[in-house]
């Protein structure tokens, strides 16, 4: 196969992932309000796609227009391909919302009322709502030499209003801009009695269209057109110019709201001259204009399920499994000393990790606590426990990653609070994101210091621990806990990388470990020994790993990869990758665990890791991979993380050589296997 065709386009692969998510919104087996949620997830993902990936392609095209990307194409060619795919996906989204979901919701008594269908009583209520809730806070900006075109915030809802007449100062007016503050709901619920006892909603844009004239008394409104600008949201900090990273991040967060435009969304009813006017204001081309059949922001529909009390239209609740040995008065440290603990979230509760930190904060025998924070949410019992530990006089060290994309402001806030509580807060290593998920507790026992560590594949975030699938290992293994301590010393101090006993770390040893393990399986296959690689991750795009997998496949290694999102490897190509199979599982839970298993002549070397197989994870982040050696725990990781995923025939998508996906289905006479439901049955409470 030609060199340029061996690697697929990562952006197209990411859009293909979102197409699989959108299939959940189409699936009649998914509860109706959950289908609406999946539609919103796709919109949110697309926002980030334009803010990050499309913005990167635009920058690359400007700086290196002739440089070929990993997929063998130049940036301009890739932009054209990606734009076409994005348009197709967005059209599909709106068709689904307008022609499928809205009618199905209406049959369930959940209505989105268009202006032309408002009853007189609804019109009266909506006008009162506008007068009471919107009119006092909206600020129209007329465009003239003293009122230049305003700079809209990233992804904010705005309206271009065409006017006729003269204002109070005798000025002729042609156009004004009205910005809708983010604090306003984009979907407004109507009183039940106005909806025949059901649930009714109107879009904020519809309310503004109907009553925008009240913002311009005495003027004639000729037209009102919603628009939304997506901006480049890359956050860059120059290492040489920064004295205080936290302060620099805070400054950059403000500037990010006003990055270069990458996408302009308007309703399909917007006239051509308004579209052209807006494109000129934002220095965008027609290729960057997206006309949609409906509201320009479907993300905000995610408020609807919480406003509708219809359990029959939502997923049934699950009960998480709990660590039975952790009784009311039991010590988690005593449990860990007996044997390492493996947790599989969300099927098993995240509470033992929280309990470990709570107990550490209150236990007089605990001398020090260390933890990394990448994403932790706006409310965190873990961070509260760290603050309590610091206030109790313990040595608390927290590595807060301030560059966690779109969580920067939240992490800055936690960093301030932790410092005020007396914790030592470190902002990682400049130029390398600290993505490793690790915690360490140091306790005095019988006159000797004993370490306890937690290593995970997911964030210390209690909210996402109920949604994302992840593994966590809690252990008192002396070599692993010593390694975790060494990693914290590397991050917080200065010096050369320490020698690790069992863990592998990026950016130093993890990539080499993966390449070496693949090479070993390749040699085993060449020698006629059984050879197999099974791995699960979020993304696989690193070219040297892909080429190593191709070599392994050519040698006869059987390779099964479970990759939820981006995968730029081509599976199933004769002579290149015929022994590689790739599947993606999309379901109620977000598959997030990273698990690698190398057969190694029957030893089944198994790791859980914070790292995907991407260049950034191997070379530009601090990551960990921990071996799972306890026989029972290894069996669990292989079965729950890999084998059951490979058996799924209800939510699995099978990747094709061209980068497309086909949904798996049970063969004739085969029973259904549903990874996530089966794990709830196996591990749930």
UniProtKB/Swiss-Prot annotation:
State the name under which the record lists this protein: Polyphosphate kinase
Which terms does the UniProt entry file under GO BP? Answer: polyphosphate biosynthetic process
Among Pfam families, the record links this protein to: PP_kinase, PP_kinase_C, PP_kinase_C_1, PP_kinase_N
UniProt-annotated catalytic positions? 435 (phosphohistidine intermediate)
Keywords, A to Z, come to: ATP-binding, Kinase, Magnesium, Metal-binding, Nucleotide-binding, Phosphoprotein, Transferase
Please report the organism this UniProt entry assigns to the protein. Neisseria meningitidis serogroup C (strain 053442)
Asked if the record carries the keyword Ligase, the reply is: no
Modifications the protein undergoes after translation, according to the UniProt entry? An intermediate of this reaction is the autophosphorylated ppk in which a phosphate is covalently linked to a histidine residue through a N-P bond.
